[in-house]
């Protein structure tokens, strides 16, 4: 699934999503690119600032193209230099998208008049190519901020994870304001997401201590007060947190092999908040193992203060059987009830 398919899905999840990237097959030149401690605070993706195009920035004129730019090694080994030159040809303007395959690199920039312009490198030549990308307010970025030099390693990771066909590294807005790197393929098989530091996003399970710890850490991020947190195989890991703005709930989700994403909604929950330091992933994992009918059975876990006690309570719904524990994993179903 391409980043654009995920973008459509995410916009059904997110409230108030306002940006979209309409990309077909991308620019064409030759072959077109396709498009048990408690969790500690860790940074989560934040919207990427979009630099404004300089009103005086002018790309290299078409009459000076094609431009010779030979490289001594393969494109993948020379990707940083090639992308840097493509960006120079584009006058250093804010970038909407970068595609890199083994044979071609393409960069699409945002012009001061809000139109877009694409340049491609192939076989030692840089040319202006047509693009079907439209600017609808999506985030722009500077390619120098992303580890283009790691493209070989990212391709190797994608291959190990079963991405088959011609591999394509894309740097592009994935959700509103969030620019991510992905490796997908042509023909499309699957997609591997990479963080800005070049590390691959793993698919987390919902029963082991390691996976539960990682999932809770990612959705807590730098948060200090939770309205609720939980996970299940359908929704993934999620957390509702306080926001800097009063009357707003910050929601974070981490589903499958997709990075954490954030949404905000206007709400003042009646439930009290609690500290993420109270969470004990090992105790949650042990409770799941105790309540599962079979080792492969999934449970829907929710932790919040909705039961009116002095500390948060964990609720486990395993195939319709509901149990409750405190944060140490002690069963308290008889104290809380069966709701």
Predicted regions located by residue number:
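Bacterial N-terminal signal peptides that target proteins for export
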Residues: 2-15
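C-terminal motif of bacterial Sec signal peptides marking the signal peptidase cleavage site
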Residues: 21-24
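Bacterial signal peptide processing site
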Residues: 26-29
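Extracytoplasmic low-complexity, Pro/Thr/Ser/Ala/Gly-rich segments
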Residues: 33-128, 204-238, 339
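Short, non-transmembrane alpha-helical segments in secretory-pathway proteins
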Residues: 68-93, 145-165, 207-223, 276-298
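Exposed beta-strand-loop-beta-strand "reactive/processing" segments of non-cytosolic proteins
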Residues: 87-114, 171-190, 221-245, 301-324
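Long, acidic/polar, low-complexity amphipathic helices and coiled-coil-like
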Residues: 97-111, 115-206
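Extracellularly exposed regions in secreted/surface proteins, prominently low-complexity, repeat-rich
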Residues: 181-225, 257-261, 265-269, 286, ...
